[in-house]
Swiss-Prot record:
Organism field: Aquifex aeolicus (strain VF5)
Identification of the protein by name: Putative L-lysine 2,3-aminomutase aq_1632
Cofactor (UniProt): [4Fe-4S] cluster; pyridoxal 5'-phosphate
Principal EC category: isomerase
UniProt-listed Enzyme Commission number(s): 5.4.3.-
InterPro entries per the UniProt record, alphabetical: Aldolase_TIM, Lys_aminomutase/Glu_NH3_mut, rSAM
Entry binding sites for [4Fe-4S] cluster: 100, 104, 107
Domain Radical SAM core positions: 86-314
Record-stated family: Belongs to the radical SAM superfamily. KamA family.
The keyword S-adenosyl-L-methionine belongs to this UniProt entry's keyword annotation: yes
Cofactor note: Binds 1 [4Fe-4S] cluster. The cluster is coordinated with 3 cysteines and an exchangeable S-adenosyl-L-methionine.
Length: 374
């Protein structure tokens, strides 16, 4: 399959979609880009119109419902130079590509795949210079797009440049490639050699932040790719949004977290689906989702249970801690403003809320003593 894998950017090449349905779905792809591949399509049960893998990659007319913003977390606010975001003091994001192995229908950066977008830096030299000039940055996240879509020699140039910056200790690669095209790893020993070099020869550490959304993505090929990357000394973790019709039921989420822990890819975050344009069909109410997450955490091992349920809000990563009959509790896990670090907030419940901004009745807030620590 690896060498024969083909990418598909036009629905007309997917024979399993009837022509009448395809014409309706093309109204969606005129607005939001479409991309899949033959390997990922092979995971779909085409007899089930609500198949979760299908929902991840095949458009639905529900995406045309007006809702949310293209830049729901206002990432542009933190763009310091072309292609670089600097939101938290110790962390920089480099947007290195505007292409992925597939385009998830719920992507919070779907704006990058639009013709008029210019946020990604194909030449990262300006971003690298910014990092060199900011010694507080000790870890860099390569993102996009999917950095593993880049040719290995291009990724090598970026990693070698980062390896030469003394204060950068950790490089993270945010990628769904092992889920959507594990042959990127299986068929490219040079990529594995690059990862091993970075971990053993630079005095620094590489992390691969995976995006497995559903247990059926954990195929034998994906598991083998995980194993090969682990052998390079790279640490693997996973993060996924909670997605309606994909992983928002107890058994699916429990299985996903358990299997990830078993193969050595411990869950890191489960995210509230961002209110990005086109995403309403995938978003779940916060107060239902916290019940789901807590129920699953109560039934899995400690390795899986340590996952945090958070929102990537404009102001920072806000953890959803729990609720009572009347109130819901939040805490800043990461805050852009030092004054908000560790802040604990109590709001009156809102069963219709899908995002932090939907909570308007603040009951109490408590500043952490951390806010004064530097």
């Amino acid at each position: 399959m690896g060498k024969k894998l083909k990418y598909i950017i036009d629905l007309k090449f997917i024979e399993e979609i009837p022509e009448e349905e395809r014409r309706e779905l093309e109204k969606v792809t005129e607005k939001f880009a479409f991309r899949t591949n033959t390997y990922y399509n092979s995971l779909i049960n085409w007899d089930n119109p609500n198949d979760p893998i299908r929902r991840i990659v095949i458009p639905t007319t529900e995406e045309l419902e007006v809702w949310g913003k293209l830049d729901a977390s206002n990432e542009s606010k933190y763009m310091k130079v072309h292609g670089l975001e600097h939101k938290y003091p110790d962390t920089a994001l480099l947007l290195v590509t505007d292409v992925c192995g597939i385009y998830c229908r719920f992507c919070f950066r779907k704006r990058l795949f639009m013709n008029d977008n210019d946020e990604v830096a194909r030449d990262v030299s300006e971003g690298l210079e910014y990092i060199r000039n900011h010694p507080e940055i000790n870890n860099v996240l390569l993102t996009g797009g999917d950095p593993l879509i880049l040719a290995t020699f291009k990724l090598e140039k970026i990693l070698k440049a980062l390896a030469e910056i003394p204060h950068v200790r950790i490089v993270r690669i945010g990628s769904k490639m092992l889920a959507v095209n594990p042959f990127r790893v299986l068929d490219d020993p040079k990529l594995l050699e690059l990862f091993e070099w970075f971990n053993t020869e630079t005095g620094k550490k590489l992390y691969l932040m995976n995006h497995f959304n559903h247990p059926r993505e954990l195929t034998k090929e994906a598991r083998k790719a995980v194993e090969l990357v682990q052998k390079t000394g790279t640490t693997l973790t996973n993060q996924t949004p909670i997605l309606k019709g994909i992983n928002d039921d107890f058994e699916t989420l429990k299985t996903l977290l358990e299997e990830l822990s078993f193969i050595g890819v411990p869950p890191y975050y489960v995210f509230q689906c961002r209110p990005t344009a086109g995403n309403k069909a995938y978003s779940t109410p916060i107060e239902e989702t916290i019940d789901l997450v807590e129920a699953v955490r109560a039934e899995v091992s400690g390795l899986a249970a340590r996952v945090r349920y958070v929102m990537s809000h404009e102001t920072g990563k806000i953890e959803i801690l729990g609720k009572t009959d009347e109130h819901i509790f939040f805490r800043y896990h990461r805050a852009a403003d030092p004054e908000n670090r560790g802040k604990f907030m109590v709001f009156k419940r809102n069963p219709e809320a899908h995002w932090f901004d939907d909570y308007t009745e603040l009951v109490a807030e408590y500043k952490s003593s951390l806010s004064g620590v530097s």
